[in-house]
Structures are given as C-alpha cells and as structure tokens.
C-alpha cells in the first residue's frame, strides 16, 4: 500500500448533506419545494464545523449527517477527530455566493466530478424513486430542482483544483478504481 493509508493517516468525513435545514425550517421559510438548493443548507454551521475540525489539536468534533430514508439531517451523526485529513463533499463547495465562497477558502484540494447530464438525470430519478417518490414526481423534482442546481454548480467548476470526468463509455462506473483508492 502507498499513500496516506500506508503512512497511518486516516481521514474523517464532514458531508455537506448533514447541513440541510430541517423540513420544519424549510416549511417555515417557504423553501421546502427547493430542498437541495444552496439556500436550503446551514452554510454557517458547515463552515464552523470545518473550522473546528481543521484547528490544530482538534478534539472530537460531532458533525451532522443526512438520512435519505428520513429526508432529514441527524445532529451529531458522526465523529471526526484528530485524523489529520478531512474529506468533505458537497455540491456547492466552489460557489462564490451566500457564504459558500468561504467554504472554498477552507478546502486545500477541491475536485469536481463531471458526469454527463443524461447520466446525472437517470441517477437522480433512480435515487428519488428509491427513497419514495413515484416516477412522475421524481422526474418533476429532477427537472425543476436538481437540474437547475446542477447547472448552477457548473458555473463554478473553474474554482476547482481538478475536474475528474467519468468515462463516456462506462457511465455507471465510479471514477475511483481500487488502485486510485489505495493511493488516497
């Protein structure tokens, strides 16, 4: 083995999805019909968590997670502690608007994974159906919420350090193979 694993360095995960505003708050703000848009996340909470995790000698940091089966965030759903490396993922990490620009400043290496739109649409519809939407509702959500968000994300790709493109001939395969994963 090579890379971080071989050096005994382990990575913690802080997923942006854990910072979805609750459905009750989204209802109160009138944003639930756009859940997943940049302003439906607690960006300030996300930034504060990144700051806590990145601090030298950081103790255990409890980070929220997202449960798709519940369609809700779960407070303190994961523990991130003195790992030395923190992996974070999310759609809006390269955006320059509404606080997201500060997220980019906290990320040492930002990678955008580029997926052809037709593949993205199929994956999103399948995911929505898997978690309870009927095919018509899933397609509507993808067209009216997810695709506009994806197009917004595409406007900020220039702020990423790298762009990984999924092979055209293997649209359902992942972008990281076993050899690449061993180097992480």
Residue ranges of model-derived segments:
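Small-molecule kinase domains that catalyze NTP-dependent phosphoryl transfer to phosphate-bearing small molecules
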Residues: 98-101, 126-177, 184
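Short glycine-/polar-rich loops that comprise or flank the Walker A/P-loop
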Residues: 9, 105-109, 157-161
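Conserved beta-strand scaffold positions in the cores of enzyme catalytic domains, especially
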Residues: 13, 110-112, 163
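Alpha-helical scaffold elements adjacent to nucleotide-binding pockets in ATP/GTP-utilizing enzyme cores
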Residues: 45, 49, 120-127, 141
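ATP-dependent NMP and nucleoside kinases share a basic, alpha-helical "lid"
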Residues: 70-127
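Conserved nucleotide-sensing/catalytic segment adjacent to the nucleotide-binding pocket
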Residues: 12-15, 21-67
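The start of beta-strands in P-loop NTPase/AAA+ ATPase cores
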Residues: 10-12, 84
